[in-house]
Amino acid sequence: MGIRRYKPTTPGRRGASVADFVEITRDHPEKSLVRPLHSKGGRNVHGRITTRHQGGGHKRAYRIIDFRRDKDGVPAKVAHIEYDPNRTARIALLHYADGEKRYIIAPVKLKQGDQVSSGVGADIKPGNALPLRNIPTGTVVHAIELRPGGGAKIARSAGASVQLVAKDGPYAQLRMPSGEIRNVDVRCRATVGEVGNAEQSNINWGKAGRMRWKGRRPTVRGVAMNPVDHPHGGGEGKTSGGRHPVNPKGRPEGRTRANHKSSDALIVRRRKQNRRR
């Protein structure tokens, strides 16, 4: 993937950029792997806003992605590399030898015509999926399961990758993009390689309208609102809110307590924190 920069023909185009899409080989999805996707606009079943800053945007269709990679022993050919509006990564359409078609996340160096497979006997090459116990230490992987058979949960976005640093009994140690080292069951599957489209993070969107096309509405600070709209609103002149940060409902915002997750016991080394001095 490369980035194409616009000429400054308008203020919105000045400095803006877009992906060049040179890796895309087809402009329409596989019909059998598409489902309708209805926009909720951040509302719940009662019509109340539960997630702010969502709404509008271009209509999308959801592409069904194979995150389990459980079709063992059946080789597949990469028929197309396609654009997916629902994620930052590109997706690859696989045609299996038995006639089935599936989508997977497209890793770096995977191209049209390549052969991929999954299972214990698969080769260590980009796009192949294996249990962690069968992947050599030091290999870069993505689309990793947290529970055996549960489907990929980690490292699925553009440019994401995780390194397998060690194996110790029933666990494999993975170094996350954040620097955290975590134990994962060696029976969990992972796909070899790094997720493609890594330059996605370098795109300059240029104008607010392009964010609206993506379904993102403006983010307004509470201190810029009136008292009727937010607990931080109002006051004479500019104020800092006058209290600890809260959400529009008045509940404390930010890091208010320590996390107590059952999976915390699997963390070997936590990521480096940016501590205030």
Curated annotation (Swiss-Prot):
Ranges of Basic residues composition bias in the record: 268-277
GO MF term list: rRNA binding; structural constituent of ribosome; transferase activity
Gene3D superfamilies: 2.30.30.30, Nucleic acid-binding proteins, Ribosomal protein L2, domain 3
Domain of life: Bacteria
CC terms in the record's Gene Ontology section: large ribosomal subunit
GO biological process, one term: cytoplasmic translation
Chain segments carrying region Disordered: 37-57, 222-277
Family from the record: Belongs to the universal ribosomal protein uL2 family.
Quaternary structure note: Part of the 50S ribosomal subunit. Forms a bridge to the 30S subunit in the 70S ribosome.
Function of the molecule: One of the primary rRNA binding proteins. Required for association of the 30S and 50S subunits to form the 70S ribosome, for tRNA binding and peptide bond formation. It has been suggested to have peptidyltransferase activity; this is somewhat controversial. Makes several contacts with the 16S rRNA in the 70S ribosome.
Name under which the protein is recorded: Large ribosomal subunit protein uL2
Source species: Frankia alni (strain DSM 45986 / CECT 9034 / ACN14a)
Gene name linked to the record: rplB
